[in-house]
């Protein structure tokens, strides 16, 4: 993407939602959940699968981080955690912190964030965050 000037926000999940099948989880993870494996929490077995997946993702984007001159400027951890599945409160916060530490350890060295617009989300105190107040009046600036 550097050749066309596009920046990338990479969504590594492990749950990405995006209105895709199983929120992006492979069928076999859902089968393991049905067999009793807890997902989207600090279950060691689940975290092992996340680590293995993220290492494979990182192998494909190694050298593509902004610090390396690449287009990846941010990485989304999880999605709608605490609203569409996941834990709330201290357990949810602990899980988001675990995922964040794992991503950094693997080498995802760009700003990390998560996305949710719902109350009860565990992420609010887990990331340094910012908010912008945007004046939006319908189609006012569409032609600019």
Show where each model-derived region lies:
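Noncatalytic carbohydrate-binding groove/subsite architecture in carbohydrate-active enzymes
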Residues: 89-144
């Amino acid at each position: 993407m550097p050749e066309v000037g596009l920046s990338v926000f990479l969504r590594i999940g492990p749950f990405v939602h995006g209105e895709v099948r199983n929120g992006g989880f492979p069928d076999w993870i859902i089968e393991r959940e049905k067999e009793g494996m807890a997902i989207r929490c600090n279950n060691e077995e689940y975290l092992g699968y996340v680590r293995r997946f993220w290492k494979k993702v990182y192998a494909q984007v190694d050298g593509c981080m902004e610090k390396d001159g690449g287009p990846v400027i941010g990485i989304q951890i999880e999605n709608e955690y605490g609203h569409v599945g996941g834990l709330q409160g201290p357990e949810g916060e602990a899980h988001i912190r675990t995922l964040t530490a794992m991503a950094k350890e693997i080498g995802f060295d760009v700003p990390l964030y998560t996305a949710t617009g719902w109350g009860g989300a565990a992420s609010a105190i887990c990331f340094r965050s910012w908010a912008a107040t945007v004046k939006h009046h319908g189609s006012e600036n569409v032609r600019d």
